[in-house]
């Protein structure tokens, strides 16, 4: 299925944001047990169900690292905000500062992934947000930095990407 340049550019940038946020969780909470009651058990249960559905086998691990790929975008930043003491202060402060912007990305992400019509301001909103992340801390936002650099060098590279079909059925 062919998609337009704007949709694929947004897809690349939002995917990079999600990858970086997941890596933040893996780096700082990945070894934590999913049985730790300080974590939202409903979130963990949803992620376990998604993992089992995707892989046709039962969940047999006990760490957050094994589930982080099955968290929604909104769940990822909420998890970081819920446990600021588990992250370096610079990261927890930045996520808290950028929570409203991350919340604004969720409907954009859903429009892209579910092949809904884009709003006229979706691309500039995501582009500006990525530039802010890079300006604030390029070492934290490695995937975002690399993706934006790649886009600046060759904007058409996104036309070779594909939006995973399974992404069409999941909300962020």
PLM region descriptions:
Residues 1-172:
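Amphipathic alpha-helical interface elements
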């Amino acid at each position: 299925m062919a998609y337009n340049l704007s949709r694929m550019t947004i897809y690349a940038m939002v995917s990079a944001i999600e990858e970086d946020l997941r890596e933040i969780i893996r780096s700082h909470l990945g070894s934590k047990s999913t049985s730790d009651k300080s974590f939202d058990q409903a979130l963990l249960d949803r992620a376990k169900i998604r993992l089992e559905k995707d892989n046709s086998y039962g969940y047999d691990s006990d760490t957050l690292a094994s589930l982080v790929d099955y968290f929604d975008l909104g769940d990822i930043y909420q998890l970081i905000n819920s446990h600021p003491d588990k992250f370096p202060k610079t990261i927890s402060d930045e996520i808290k500062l950028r929570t409203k912007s991350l919340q604004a990305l969720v409907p954009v992400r859903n429009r892209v992934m579910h092949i809904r019509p884009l709003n006229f301001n979706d691309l500039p909103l995501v582009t500006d947000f990525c530039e802010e992340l890079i300006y604030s801390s390029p070492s934290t936002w490695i995937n975002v930095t690399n993706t934006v650099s790649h886009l600046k060098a060759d904007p058409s590279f996104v036309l070779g990407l594909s939006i995973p079909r399974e992404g069409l059925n999941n909300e962020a």
